[in-house]
From Swiss-Prot:
Belongs to the bacterial ribosomal protein bL27 family. GO terms for molecular function: structural constituent of ribosome. Keywords: Ribonucleoprotein, Ribosomal protein. This is Large ribosomal subunit protein bL27. The lineage of its organism: Bacteria, Pseudomonadati, Chlorobiota, Chlorobiia, Chlorobiales. GO terms for cellular component: ribonucleoprotein complex; ribosome.
Length: 84
């Protein structure tokens, strides 16, 4: 006979790895071409002037300049790069 109870199991003992999403370059900061400005799931914020969109919806700078967030058409958020 066992002298200790069985350990049992749980269905909750795991956690996903962090994804490090969010804004990487704040509005008003200067960036170089290729710098990641924002990592996101889906296109909550769309790329504007001089900003590109990666296949995982990452927004990055296409030119050297200053980051500028604004509300675009239909009040959708956009990120522009104002060339320096």
């Amino acid at each position: 006979m066992a002298h200790k109870k069985g350990g049992g199991s749980t269905k909750n003992g795991r956690d996903s790895n962090p994804k490090y999403l969010g804004v990487k370059a704040a509005g008003g900061s200067t960036v170089n071409a290729g710098t990641i400005i924002l990592r996101q799931r889906g296109t909550a914020i769309k790329p504007g002037d001089n900003a590109g969109l990666g296949k995982d919806h990452t927004i990055f700078a296409l030119v050297d300049g200053t980051v500028h967030f604004r509300n675009g058409r239909n009040n959708k958020k956009q990120v522009d790069i104002i060339p320096s």
